[in-house]
């Protein structure tokens, strides 16, 4: 039996789950523009109140992947995405964007999926622009960058044009919906390994199980106990690790890796320009909390990508490329590549 928007809404109102295959049907209708804005808003609000299940999220993400413009990476060895949901409210500099250059310098291939700022002071696309990079690369160009340099940035509006269908509804609603947690699940390069930060500890285990349903090989889903959607320096971090088809939860702390606990205020910025300055200081090897948090997150990415034996080993590898300048070299190569591609 087909799942219509009306049936879905009735199911949600009754606090009953929409099964994964039913969610696939529903999302295809929404993405094809077959569901009115009023019904889309009602369904999104209802799912938020009911709380989205693993199957519902996986079904919706499956359809978003179907509709995306894919990036075909030939050599997928050590291919990883470093991504966050955003929305943690802490306004830190672009930690995961900085970490992608570090991870690439240490041997991973990073296919990062991101966008402009929605609630933060600086989105990944915003800081890349002020660093001089062109963010609007086409899928073939992103694949070439990953192959040549080891890093590529996929600007969400280019790879998910169908999102324009629901953008007006989301904008008018002005609240978090399932789409806020779908972005990190819909990497156009289908990276088999992922380091994902989430804004809510309740999402750690959920997103790890969703990634398993979507075919991820390895994943670390993390949320600082302070609400940070990265591995945090300020407190312990809850981790959901997907490996070998199983998910296990545990906690890590900065002290586990020889780092001092440091308040988030040391990482906060007010603009993309301030984020750029902090990012460049890190890539120049300037010691401090900003470098530590990047090394920690890059280390986790290197572990989940299969480059490092564990997070601690990853932190060592990340620190080496930060202090010897290799991470900064990757940034410079990437900026030069994107500018050449943009002006061809």
Swiss-Prot record:
Keyword Heme found: no
Pfam families (UniProt xref): Glycos_trans_3N (PF02885), Glycos_transf_3 (PF00591)
Catalytic activity as recorded in UniProt: N-(5-phospho-beta-D-ribosyl)anthranilate + diphosphate = 5-phospho-alpha-D-ribose 1-diphosphate + anthranilate
Record-level Gene Ontology MF annotations: anthranilate phosphoribosyltransferase activity; magnesium ion binding
Listed cofactors: Mg(2+)
Residues reported in the UniProt entry to bind 5-phospho-alpha-D-ribose 1-diphosphate: 84, 87-88, 92, 94-97, 112-120, 124
Binding site for anthranilate 1: 84, 115
One biological process term in Gene Ontology: L-tryptophan biosynthetic process
Record-listed Mg(2+) 2 binding positions: 229-230
Residues at which anthranilate 2 binds: 170
Binding residues for Mg(2+) 1: 96, 230
Source domain of life: Bacteria
Family statement: Belongs to the anthranilate phosphoribosyltransferase family.
Name the UniProt record assigns to this protein: Anthranilate phosphoribosyltransferase
Protein's organism: Xylella fastidiosa (strain M12)
